[in-house]
Structure formats: structure tokens, C-alpha cells
Amino acid sequence: MEIGVDIVEIARIRSSYDRFGEAFMKKILTSAEMAQCLSKPDPVASLAGRFAAKEAVSKALGTGIAKGLTWHSIEVLNDETGKPCVSVYAPSFSGRVSISISHDRYSAVAMALFEPR
């Protein structure tokens, strides 16, 4: 088992979103993730949570973003109960990833657990 954790300041993500708009979201999120974020009361807080989640997953996998993974290689979507679920689209990926995401007014944090096969 491998663990990855990431925390991000929502203000930092909001600043990038204010500067680059939906182009910033499209760089980080898949179209399905973007649709879920935009449906939330504060889409930028949701974006920050997804950003932290993808960083946490990349750390748990031991690769980081840009070493075999792209932002779109990791997809974090909520199921019908609201639970975040991870899909990893990478040829060398084999295993299961669980994720937990939380945020307050200032920060978003995520923890990922990778169980290799």
C-alpha cells in the first residue's frame, strides 16, 4: 500500500481561475469533472479539492504529475452518494485507488491510498 497527501490553498486556485478562467479548469479537469465542479455552489473550492486529489493520487502512485501521468490521466468523480471515486488512465497502472477529499474556507486537502495488484 502507498499513501499520498496534498493540501492546497483555495485562494491560490481561485487566483489562477480568475486569471485564466475555464481554460485553467480544462487544463486540470476532464469534461465530466468540470461538469460536476460547475454544479457546486462554489466551483473553485471543488476545483481545489480535485487539484489536491490528483496531486495526492500522483504521489501515492510514486510518479507525480508529468512523470507518466497527466492531469487528465486521473479522474475524480463523485458517485450517487457523493463519495469521490478515482479512475486512472495510464498503460502501466494496475491496482485500486481510494480517495478522501475535504475543504474549509481556506484549504482543500486530499489523501489517496493506492493498493497495487
UniProtKB/Swiss-Prot annotation:
Annotated signal peptide: none
Gene Ontology biological process terms from the UniProt entry: fatty acid biosynthetic process
Keywords: Cytoplasm, Fatty acid biosynthesis, Fatty acid metabolism, Lipid biosynthesis, Lipid metabolism, Magnesium, Metal-binding, Transferase
Tree of life domain: Bacteria
UniProt catalytic activity: apo-[ACP] + CoA = holo-[ACP] + adenosine 3',5'-bisphosphate + H(+)
Record Gene3D superfamilies: 4'-phosphopantetheinyl transferase domain
Cofactor: Mg(2+)
Main location: cytoplasm
Any one Gene Ontology molecular-function term assigned to this protein's record: magnesium ion binding
Assigned protein family: Belongs to the P-Pant transferase superfamily. AcpS family.
Function, as annotated: Transfers the 4'-phosphopantetheine moiety from coenzyme A to a Ser of acyl-carrier-protein.
The name this protein goes by in its record: Holo-[acyl-carrier-protein] synthase
Organism annotation: Chlorobaculum tepidum (strain ATCC 49652 / DSM 12025 / NBRC 103806 / TLS) (Chlorobium tepidum)
